[in-house]
């Protein structure tokens, strides 16, 4: 499928979206974005891998929570139903790692509304599985969110939070 006559309706960090009739075409690129930083370097084949992995997970989890996936069109393109994006990243954690470990190492013991005990080490299993949501920033850093912040800032309603929190824990399990 050629995109010569189409302009993206949105250019993301690694994916571009195009209106295709009533649906959306998602094109996964070879661009690199890690830890909220976009690189000028690309990785050949990354878009194909990302597209394939995303399609696999959409198919695998669609019975737990409905999603927008329709079909893979080719190695880097998929067709999805048009949907409204919720600007929250629903990050589940079972282990102390990444940005949570960084904040914990700085002495922060209350993160994302959870109180963590002293003495945890990098990659150690957390006392419980934790939902650690962040903003979904188009540019720059995603910021940690609590349930109250997400609802107060109207990123989600209380009912949307309940449904998505429940689905996140089901998907993690």
Regions found by a protein language model. Give the residues of each.
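A long amphipathic alpha-helix within ATP-dependent nucleotide-binding catalytic cores
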Residues: 153-173
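A short mid-domain helix/strand-loop element embedded in enzyme catalytic domains
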Residues: 126-156
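Active-site loop/lid in soluble adenylation, ligation, and acyl-transfer enzymes
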Residues: 1-136
């Amino acid at each position: 499928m050629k995109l010569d006559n189409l302009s993206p309706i949105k250019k993301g960090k690694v994916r571009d979206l195009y209106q295709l009739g009533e649906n959306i075409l998602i094109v996964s690129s070879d661009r690199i974005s890690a830890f909220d930083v976009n690189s000028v370097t690309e990785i050949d084949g990354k878009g194909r891998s990302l597209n394939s992995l995303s399609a696999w997970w959409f198919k695998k989890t669609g019975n737990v929570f409905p999603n927008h996936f329709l079909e893979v069109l080719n190695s880097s393109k998929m067709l999805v139903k048009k949907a409204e994006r919720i600007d929250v990243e629903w990050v589940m954690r079972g282990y102390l790692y990444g940005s949570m470990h960084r904040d914990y190492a700085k002495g922060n013991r209350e993160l994302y509304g959870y109180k963590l005990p002293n003495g945890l080490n990098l990659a150690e299993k957390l006392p419980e599985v934790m939902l650690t949501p962040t903003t979904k920033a188009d540019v720059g850093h995603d910021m940690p969110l609590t349930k109250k912040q997400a609802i107060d800032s109207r990123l989600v309603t209380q009912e949307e939070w309940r449904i998505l929190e429940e689905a996140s824990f089901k998907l993690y399990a």
